[in-house]
Amino acid sequence: MYKIGLTGGIGSGKSRVADMLAEWGASVIDADEISHALTAPGGAAMPAIAREFGPQAVAADGALDRAWMRDLVFREPAARGRLEALLHPLIGLHTEQAAAQARGLYLVFVVPLLVESGRWRGRVDRICVVDCDPATQIARVQKRSGLTEPAIRRIMAAQAARATRLEAADDVIVNDGATSPDTLRARARTLHDRWLALAGAASQPGGKAAGTPE
């Protein structure tokens, strides 16, 4: 199946684009949704997180205490690597299981840290970045989450620089503060139609999709 890696910084609007692609028939696998399920009450990652970080990492309902973890990572940057070492193998396993069951027109992996991980270039046929300026990111995240600007900037600092993401992109969807919902939809539709054509070509004899042996 033809594979798209969809990414973008926090607040860029990648989830909104992913929802549109799903509406039009793509199979969408969201790494963030998998991560949240793994760290929800009873989530598969929670026993290992509790062992690694202690009971203070677990909220009263049994989920990951995200505010506590954000504070820890700010004070001890190495804690991010410890958490990712627990989560990433599980996310990878669940991602592959979902991909094996996908039956859409093509497959979209929504991965916030796609560029940062360095593991996705060979797993997807194209990388698409949903892009906006930092001020727009901050405004959107403040509106939806109530996080302070310093907290948001810390999250942004842990992600790839905007220029780095754009350099890795095969396709870019601009979703800045001036982009209307209709314009965003039109931009996403243009790429959807392009990917459908590429998926069709890859499925023909002699066509090749990511992960296919030479």
UniProtKB/Swiss-Prot annotation:
UniProt-annotated location(s): Cytoplasm
Keyword ATP-binding on entry: yes
Principal cellular location given in the protein's record: cytoplasm
Domain DPCK residues, every copy: 3-202
Binding site for ATP: 11-16
UniProt-listed InterPro entries: Depp_CoAkinase (IPR001977), P-loop_NTPase (IPR027417)
Annotated keywords: ATP-binding, Coenzyme A biosynthesis, Cytoplasm, Kinase, Nucleotide-binding, Transferase
UniProt-recorded Gene Ontology molecular function terms: ATP binding; dephospho-CoA kinase activity
Membrane-spanning ranges: none
EC number: 2.7.1.24
A GO cellular component annotation in the UniProt record: cytoplasm
Catalytic activity: 3'-dephospho-CoA + ATP = ADP + CoA + H(+)
UniProt entry tagged with the keyword Ligase: no
One GO biological process term: coenzyme A biosynthetic process
Family designation: Belongs to the CoaE family.
PANTHER family: BIFUNCTIONAL COENZYME A SYNTHASE-RELATED (PTHR10695:SF46), DEPHOSPHO-COA KINASE-RELATED (PTHR10695)
Stated role: Catalyzes the phosphorylation of the 3'-hydroxyl group of dephosphocoenzyme A to form coenzyme A.
NCBIfam families (UniProt xref): dephospho-CoA kinase
Name the record gives this protein: Dephospho-CoA kinase
Organism of origin: Bordetella parapertussis (strain 12822 / ATCC BAA-587 / NCTC 13253)
